[in-house]
Regions:
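Acidic/histidine-rich helix-loop elements
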Residues: 1-3
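Detector for methionine-enriched segments
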Residues: 5, 11-13, 114, 125, ...
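Cys-nucleophile CN-hydrolase/nitrilase-fold catalytic domain and related Cys-dependent amidase chemistry
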Residues: 5-86, 92, 154-174
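Structural motif
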Residues: 23-24, 122, 146
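Active-site flanking residues adjacent to catalytic metal/cofactor-binding acidic residues
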Residues: 28, 128, 179
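Active-site/binding-pocket entry motifs
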Residues: 31-32, 99, 183
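CN hydrolase (nitrilase-like) catalytic-core segments centered on the catalytic cysteine
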Residues: 48-65, 131-199
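Active-site catalytic loop in hydrolytic enzyme cores
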Residues: 71-142, 150-163, 167, 172
């Protein structure tokens, strides 16, 4: 996790130093926790990760959408949390559609979560949520202008990743901004990458 934290901080600072007028930086699903065994993911580590993301938003002076895990009393949630530069949490979404073995170890979320930046209403989705058109439709019906998607999508479903990005955007008339993990993830699993913006 420490190495992941160093990489995240370096990337966030690079964006902050080289890009002007950035309103939101997105990081992929469970960005810091790759390689963590879930039974070992305790409240102390969960809180440490939460505090880290808060500090990153403050350091870069912009909003950060962080894919993270959170340990609560009833179990572990797969979250996408938006941290403001002043330390506030603007949005906190728990993944609704858990994928395969996630169902054995994680608790599903139950609610749509939207937040607003500069008059733009943004809905949050995580990875497998993207495969369900009803969820993005519900966001659109509730006035969402943009979907922010944090993911850890893997091969061989790379074509499906592209299709979901294009479909969710065009079928709802919304922008879709998605970020995906890239490269080998262990046990022969390779993540697609291919982060994109569709309109």
């Amino acid at each position: 996790i420490k190495k992941n934290m160093e990489n995240v901080e370096k990337m966030a600072m690079t964006v902050a130093e080289n890009e002007k007028n950035v309103d939101l930086i997105l990081f992929h699903e469970a960005c810091l926790e790759s390689g963590v065994q879930l039974p070992e993911f305790d409240k102390k580590l969960s809180d440490e990760i939460h505090d880290f993301w808060k500090s990153i938003a403050k350091k870069v002076g912009t909003n950060v959408l962080a894919g993270r895990l959170e340990r609560k009393e009833d179990g572990i949630y797969n979250k996408a949390t938006v941290y403001a530069p002043d330390g506030r949490i603007l949005a906190d979404y728990a993944k609704i559609h858990l994928f395969n073995s996630e169902r054995e170890t994680l608790i599903p979320g139950k609610e749509l979560v939207m937040f607003e930046l500069n008059g733009i209403k943004i809905g949050i989705m995580i990875c497998a949520d993207f495969g369900f058109p009803e969820l993005s439709r519900a966001y659109a019906v509730n006035g969402c202008h943009m979907l922010a998607v944090t993911s850890s999508w893997a091969y061989p479903d790379d074509d499906l990743w592209t299709i979901c990005n294009q479909a969710r955007s065009s079928e709802n008339g919304v922008y879709c901004v998605s970020v995906d993990r890239i490269g080998p993830a262990g046990n022969g699993c390779v993540k697609v990458g291919r982060s994109m913006v569709c309109n």
